């Protein structure tokens, strides 16, 4: 296997599958589908913003005698809704798909989440392949089988654990991604460095000189390892992937899923978690400063602007990881050593919101 082609295995109790990484994979979609022995009729869902890439994949599938039927989904977090879910499953029924049929979803995390959820419930479950087109979805949401939609009250409150058949990552699609979206994706890569891998942080700090293919590969490896150990968040191991997400999700909900990108919210959440870790666990000041410098290096925010404390607190109370009225926070004892804490007091939360709400 040469450096341009990497296959990372994800092993879970419900399914083992490969994440395939390589430049030009979109043009090889037909061949990859043939290797998977997919049925001829394929539902190809794509984000309207990446129609060009969807067309490339459709052409490849047709060249290998598949019959892709395309459905465009509007871009944006608003598509993680019951309305979009209904649109998708209705279209699947009209396409006359059966239980051996497959969905291929081309787009970012929003499309992957709602397409995966549709796959999990249509005919009580059909297979799906994810083709992530944003950096964030490549390194995070496409791996691990979390699917779902949002409610007005909070993010990902309706969904399922349902693993894909495969994930195809073609880094060439990132060439058309805006710098802001690249930075948003980098937030999740930074997360992996903070919870697991100092060497990954070293590479991240090189910025323009960093090896993007390596950053993607290493992030996928870390997530695959964690998901393999705790697919359905039963043991607590998978919870470490929520570093920065407890507050991050609350900020997104309080913002109405509008101006703040997921990666930006996670960046603020990681900053907050480091400050709390310093306050409660003596997490080193220099490590907090290191995170701040990395976030600033990628133009990621440290504070949320224009949000009310009341709205953020209400959103925190709807956190889906809440148990018996208690919210779990992922804190760090040191870089690479995360812990789950349920001992965050109201005073701690009041303090941290003063620190990160501008």
From Swiss-Prot:
CDD domains: DHQS
Subcellular location: Cytoplasm
Pfam families associated with the record: DHQ_synthase (PF01761), DHQS_C (PF24621)
Alphabetized UniProt keyword annotations: Amino-acid biosynthesis, Aromatic amino acid biosynthesis, Cobalt, Cytoplasm, Lyase, Metal-binding, NAD, Nucleotide-binding, Zinc
One of the record's GO molecular function terms: 3-dehydroquinate synthase activity
Cofactor: how and how many bound: Binds 1 divalent metal cation per subunit. Can use either Co(2+) or Zn(2+).
Protein name: 3-dehydroquinate synthase
Gene name tied to this protein: aroB
């Amino acid at each position: 296997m040469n450096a341009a082609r990497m296959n990372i295995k994800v092993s879970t109790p419900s399914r083992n599958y490969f994440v395939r990484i390589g430049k030009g994979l979109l043009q090889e979609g037909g061949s990859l589908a043939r290797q998977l022995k997919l049925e001829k009729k394929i539902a190809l869902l794509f984000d309207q913003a990446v129609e060009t890439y969807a067309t490339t994949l459709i052409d490849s599938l047709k060249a290998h005698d598949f019959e892709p039927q395309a459905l465009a989904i509007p871009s944006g977090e608003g598509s993680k809704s019951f309305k979009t879910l209904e649109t998708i499953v209705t279209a699947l029924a009209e396409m006359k798909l059966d239980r051996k049929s497959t969905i291929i979803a081309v787009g970012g995390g929003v499309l992957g989440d709602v397409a995966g959820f549709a796959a999990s419930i249509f005919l009580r479950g059909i297979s799906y392949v994810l083709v992530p087109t944003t950096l964030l979805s490549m390194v995070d949401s496409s791996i691990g089988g979390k699917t779902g939609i949002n409610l007005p009250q909070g993010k990902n409150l309706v969904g399922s654990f349902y693993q894909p058949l495969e994930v195809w990552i073609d880094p060439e699609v990132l060439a058309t991604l805006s710098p802001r979206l690249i930075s948003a994706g980098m937030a999740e890569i930074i997360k992996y460095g903070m919870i697991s891998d100092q060497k990954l942080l070293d590479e991240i700090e090189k910025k323009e000189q960093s090896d993007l293919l390596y950053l993607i590969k290493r992030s996928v490896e870390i997530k695959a390892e964690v998901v393999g150990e705790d697919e359905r968040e039963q043991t607590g191991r998978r919870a470490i992937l929520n570093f920065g997400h407890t507050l991050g999700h609350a900020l997104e909900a309080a913002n109405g899923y509008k101006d703040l990108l997921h990666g930006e919210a996670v960046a603020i959440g990681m900053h907050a978690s480091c400050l709390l870790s310093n306050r409660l666990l003596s997490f080193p000041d220099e490590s907090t400063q290191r995170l701040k410098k990395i976030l600033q290096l990628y133009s990621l925010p440290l504070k949320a602007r224009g949000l009310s404390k009341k709205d953020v607190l209400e959103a925190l109370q709807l956190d889906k990881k809440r148990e018996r009225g208690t919210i779990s926070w992922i804190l760090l004892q040191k870089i690479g050593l995360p812990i789950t804490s349920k001992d965050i007091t109201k005073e701690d939360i009041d303090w941290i919101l003063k620190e990160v709400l501008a």
